[in-house]
Each structure stands twice: as C-alpha cells, then as structure tokens.
Amino acid sequence: MFQISELANYRLCKRCSGRIFAYHYHGISNLERGEYLQFAIGCETGNPDFSFVDSKNCDICHGIFDRFDDIYDLVAKKVGDAQYSTFLVGSVFPQDTIRMEEDIQKKFGSSGESIKKEFNREFGKYFSARTGKEYSQDNPDLTILVNAEYLFVDVKIRSIYIYGKYRKFRRDMPQTRWIHRPNGDTVESVIGSVFTRYAGGTNYYLHGSGREDVDVRMLGNGREFVLEVENPRYREFELDPVVKEINTSGKGVEIFDVKFSSHDAVSEVKLEKHRKVYDALVVSDRPIDESRLLEACINLTGKNIYQRTPLRVAQRRSDLVRTRRIDQVDLVGVSANEAEILISAEAGTYIKELVNGDGGRTRPSLSEMYGSPLNVKELDVIKICRGED
C-alpha cells in the first residue's frame, strides 16, 4: 500500500501530481487536486512548508501548461485568416514522458489520466475562450496538433466539398488530370481551378459518378460529381458567381445543381450505378444495310452480353469477364456507311466494344449480329437514369 508522502520523492508539479488521482474526488481540476495533495503531504510528513516543484522544473510537463499563450500565437500564425467554426486539439509528447507518467500512476493505483488528455482538454478550453470557436471531435473544420517537446504546431484545415452535375461538350477532354499529361484542360481542372480560387484553397480533386472517355461528350441531364478543395481559407461563399464563371469560360464544361456538401457525398456519388442512354454514330467500311442493322438492333435489345476487359484499358484494369444487360438498341437512321443508334445499357457497359466486338472479347456484339465490322465514330452520353430524372 502506498503512502501519499511518497509523491515527494518525484520532481512533480501540482498539476501532474493531481493528475495521478484524476478519477478520485470528481468536480475539481487536477491543479486543485494537487493543492490538496500538497497539504496532505505536509501534514503526513510534519513539514507544513512542503510544496511540489514549479511547473517549469516538473519532469512530466516541463511547464507546457504555462505556455498556452505561446502555443496560441503559433496556431494563429499558421491559420491566418482561414475561416472555421469548429476545432479539435491533439498533442504529441515524448515517449519517455509518457512511460514515466504511466510508471508513477501504476505505483499509486493507476487511477489517473494522461498528460495528453489533460493538455488537449485544457488547451481546447483556452483556445475556445480566445477565439469563440467551438471545440468538436466530430469532423472539425480545424485540427491543431501540438508537439509539446519542441513547441511546434501543425494545423489541418478540413476540405470543403461541392456537389453538382456537369455536362462536357468537347471530344478531347479527360475527366481528371493525368500524371503523364499535366497540361491541357480536363473537366476537373476547368471546375476545380475556379472553385479553388474562390475558396483560397491549395489543391482540388474531382470525384465523379463514373467517367466518360476522353472523346465522349457528356450531355443530357449531366454527370454527378463532388469537388474537394483542400486547405480552404473560405468555407462559405456565393456559388452563383463561380458557376457563371465556369459556364461562360468557353472551355466546354457546364455545371448545374451546385451546392455545398460533405465528405460523405464522395462515397455516395462513387457508389451509385445508373443505367445510361447513349447516342452512337456508327460507321462501316461499306454502305450499311439498313434492314440488317435494324434486325441486329432488335436482336441485341434485352440481351445479356459478356465483356472481357477491353484491350484498350487492359493495362490498367483487372482482366475479368463482366455480364452487362443491354436494355434497348434503337436504330435512328442510316446514311451511306454511317448510322445513328440509341443504346440504353447497364452501368459499366463498354459501348465501343459492344459495337465493335473487341476481337471477340465482347459477345454478342452489334458487329457480330450485323455480320460485318462496325465501329463507333462518335459517342455521346445523353442520359443517366437516376431516380429523380
């Protein structure tokens, strides 16, 4: 059984001594608890002048709780004029300090709390009092990480997320930026660069509900996306001017139904799988037999097809055979060696390969049913069949 007076053998301040018994005598602070312990030790040892060491000489905290003003100034300098409403505090202490505290607490019954927990709580109270911002563990706008040993701070500003839908009117534009193609417009850059400027952010990422090929236009009711802007200085701003600037830029992208969203929307958008309707301009190396093509379209309607990963994407996709349903294939018209066809198909269907057969990797294909090679000359997505559309 330990005696309280044994605490006098350690170089501890009042706060760190009180924290050893944090789960006793509720309703008081660790500093107040340390005051009681100091008095009790003085009585137990017959030394009324006994006192714990000053915090700056404490072997556990080294006076970190007296440096809140300095830490605040470091945080304020890093945050600058960035907007935020909620914040969270985290901290890093030397492992030697953590182990020493744990050993002492074990000796006295292991009923204390860690210095990290108290620091995070107390600096959080201090920071909230100075800024008027709310301490929150639930998705905070600002996360503060304090290195107590070196008095270094790092801050992380939570990204903002903007939901919307886009149309793409060009046949030379990928959806997202490529590492091997850093220059040139993309849907991501056309949208993201403008939003990032308005938000005062440092980078951006477009998360789309699927993607169309570079040479495929996205028309009709548009494709859903969530744009993530990293390290925004401004969390709230008018969206209409941003939308107008993007839509009048002449870069071939139009956005609509735009609103602020959350990180959860990223996974929601990416997980959604919707049937799509395509307008395909199909070409043959000889004049097209309209009646044969019409029969092929009718025969392909309602069929399940089997698609092995296309050769054009095999280097970056798993080599699998996928089953896809073709809901409707309608022949719109024929002109010489070209034909316009409307195709409604399950999400994930490779439409170009549905038409050309990809050397037998897609079966049945329109070419197979027509009895002669066909290829897609131009392709547009004209509708994504979402529930609300």
Swiss-Prot record:
Entry binding sites for substrate: 278, 350
Record-linked Pfam families: Pus10_C, Pus10_THUMP_arc
Alphabetical list of Gene3D superfamilies matching this protein: 3.30.70.2510, 3.30.70.3190
GO terms (BP aspect): tRNA pseudouridine synthesis
Gene: pus10
Name of protein: tRNA pseudouridine synthase Pus10
GO terms of molecular function: tRNA binding; tRNA pseudouridine(55) synthase activity
Active site: 213 (nucleophile)
Keywords of the record: Isomerase, RNA-binding, tRNA processing
Principal EC category: isomerase
Function according to Swiss-Prot or TrEMBL: Responsible for synthesis of pseudouridine from uracil-54 and uracil-55 in the psi GC loop of transfer RNAs.
EC number: 5.4.99.25
UniProt family annotation: Belongs to the pseudouridine synthase Pus10 family.
Reaction(s) the record says it catalyses: uridine(54) in tRNA = pseudouridine(54) in tRNA; uridine(55) in tRNA = pseudouridine(55) in tRNA
